[in-house]
Structures are given as C-alpha cells and as structure tokens.
Amino acid sequence: MPDFKFIHAADLHLDSPLLGLAGKSADFASRIEAASREAFDNLVELAIAEGCRFVLLAGDIFDGDLRNFQTGLYFVEGMRRLGDAGIDVLMILGNHDSQNRFADKLSMTQNVHVFPKAAATSRSLDDVAVTVHGRSYPRWDLSEDIARDYPPATAGTLNIGVLHTACAGSEGDHARYAPCTPEQLANHGYDYWALGHVHERAILSEHPHIVYPGNLQGRHARETGPKGAMLVAVEDGRIATVEHRALDVVRWHAASFDACAHDDQTEMLTALRDDLAQVADTADGRPVALRLTIRGATPLHPHLTLNRAALREDIETLLATLSGDHWLEKLVLATTLPPAADTFDPSIGGRLAAEIDRLVGEGVEGTLEARLAEIRAKLPAGAHADAFIEQMRSDIPTRAAELARSLVSEVGHAAD
C-alpha cells in the first residue's frame, strides 16, 4: 500500500455570519463577511500543498438555506480546483445542509462523491486501498442512530467512516442529531471515524481514531481558539499521524485580567497591554475578536464602573497599538471593592467599628423607617411590596456601615 495523506474537515458553514461584530467599520465588516470563504480557500490550498489523495467533508458545508446561490457556486469552484490537482472529495450532508434547498442539486465536478441519503454506502479508492463509508442526512432533525447501519469493514483496506453526529460525551450544547457512542464506533471495525457536527476539536479515541476536527472558522465568542482541519498521514496502511492545521481567518479569544494588584488605572492598562500582546502573538498574525473580562477586588472598581465607555475606548486604543488588527467584541466588568482593611491599631480599630455600628444604628433607623413609610403610602392598593421593603430594611443599615468603614479605611490609607 502506498503512503499518502488526506484531510478531514467539517462544519464549513460557508457564508455564515460572524455574530457580535456587526456595526464595526466598513472595512472590518467586509473582512468578517468573507471569513468563511477565506477559510475554505485555505482548506483547498492546504490539500493541494500537502499533495493529499482525498478530502473528507463530514457535513454542514452550508449554513442552512442558501442566502445566495453564489455560495454554492463558490463551493463548486473549490471542488474544481481540488479536481484539477488530482484530489478526490468524499462528503456527506449534515443537518444544516438538509435545510438547504440547493445542497444536493449543485452540479459537482467528477472528483466529488456525495454519499446518498437513503442508506449508508461505501466508496473504494483502490489505488490506496481505502474504503470510505458514509451517509447524508435525509432530513435536518435526524434523531436516529444511523451509525449502527454503516456497512461492515472491508477486509484488506483502510476503513474510514464519515458521520455527522452528536457522539455521547462530546455534544456540548449541540443538538443530539444521529446520536451514537464512542464505544459503538470503536467496535465497528473501522480504522478512522471522520466526525462532524460538534464545533470543538476532539480526539475521542486513538484505537481506532475517532475524531472531530471542529469547525473551519469560529463564528462567535463561544467558538474560541484555533479552528481548521485535520491532516492525516497514512503509512504502511495504518494511520500514522493526525495533525490539526489552523485555517481560520479571524480568531476569537476570551481573556480574563485580574485587576486586584492595581490601584492606578494607568498602571493597570500597562499591565493589560502586556497580556493583550501575548494574545495577539498566539494568533499568528490573524485578527483577534476579543471578549475581555476584568475581574478582581480593586480600589478602581467605582471608577471603572462609572467610566465603562471611556475604559472601553482605552482598551480599544491599546489593541490598536499591537501588531495586526484586533477588536474588542465585548468588555465584561466583574470587579469589586476590596474588603475594608483595618489600618489602625487593633484595639482602636475594634472600638471604632463598634462605634460605627452604634452610630449607624441610631442615625439610620429613624430616617429609614420614615422613608419606608413614605414609600408604602405611595404604593397602589394591593401592591405586594412587603418582601421588597423588608429587604431594604435589612440591607440599608448594613450597606451604610460598610460604606462608613470603607471611608474610614480610605482616610487611614491616605494617612499612611
């Protein structure tokens, strides 16, 4: 048997919009709109550059119903380029493709084999002693286990199953279409299962290989990290290596920054820039769509919260200073005030805390009760506000005491 390579890809979702990045600059919007096509082009170019014998596409080539028939024509042109390079394509249609009116009506080039919908069938590639088994979805909401009906392994060949499935333990928040289990697939006698549907890259087993390549291009903030396809090398009739190759055009990243060590915003932003530079470096020159969470207990909490828009502008400015083009998709503020520190002599601090509690109790109680009475008088008859009022009665004195301690603590820090 000759040695060769093949590519396993899935979930191309051609022309799928990237969510959460609308309303950016016109230049950015046009780049985002083209991201799935450019990732597809990268797939075609990788197969040609690596001299692959064939490409496996494990479903969801399209993103539901075609918004533009040009999407289908673009895909066919990519198949033609592979054919010109002597590369076969074996593909199945997934749940999104089955929602598409044109997916099974496109006039494919001769190098493309689309597995039928009625039943799982086999396709032989005699020159490399490979048998590929697969089945397309007959409808989008396929809930049956179709893997059990895949043909038995063909003796004397490398057997590959192509399946669009929510395999148990890896489905995440994906719909449970064509469910199966890794144990079931492992017992089928195939050498490699080329799976699709789940957008997270995963190798469920290596004996045999049961593999999700993940999707080709991340589409929103939950699809982070490198996206692409699997490049598989076959030597002496056996799977030798399975290597992920990143093909995405825009990289989604979720970052968390701990602000607890900072009480000066300029210093905080300097440290944040260092972190963001590392994020940009890991993207290998790709634009990064960033969801940033700033967390931790910091004295800056009130200022950051009250000046969120200005903070966002500062972070966008930081991103603009980095090499490449990067965007802040969302800023999440999860900071808090640090607990009030006792900066005085312990005996003095204890007496001061007790005095604060006494003064708050005496000063707030009367004012609070009068104010609650006014609120009750303004409520319409029958309003069920007792729980709300009791919560206010409980919370306000506590918050007043916390604020008083915080102010005293700040004075103590200032005195240091």
PLM regions with names:
Residues 247-416:
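Accessory, non-catalytic peripheral segments of nucleic-acid enzymes
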Residues 19, 25, 54, 65-211, ...:
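His/Asp/Glu-rich metal-coordinating catalytic cores
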Residues 8, 116, 134, 212, ...:
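Structural signal for conserved beta-strand scaffold positions within catalytic alpha/beta enzyme cores
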Residues 3, 119-126, 213-278, 291-293:
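Binuclear metal-dependent phosphoesterase catalytic core
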Residues 3, 51, 189, 286-288, ...:
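Short loop/turn motifs at secondary-structure junctions
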Residues 1-71, 391-397:
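N-terminal active-site segment of His-dependent metallophosphoesterases
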Residues 6-8, 56, 160-162, 194, ...:
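Structural motif
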Residues 37-48, 76, 147-151, 269-273, ...:
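Amphipathic, non-transmembrane alpha-helical secondary structure
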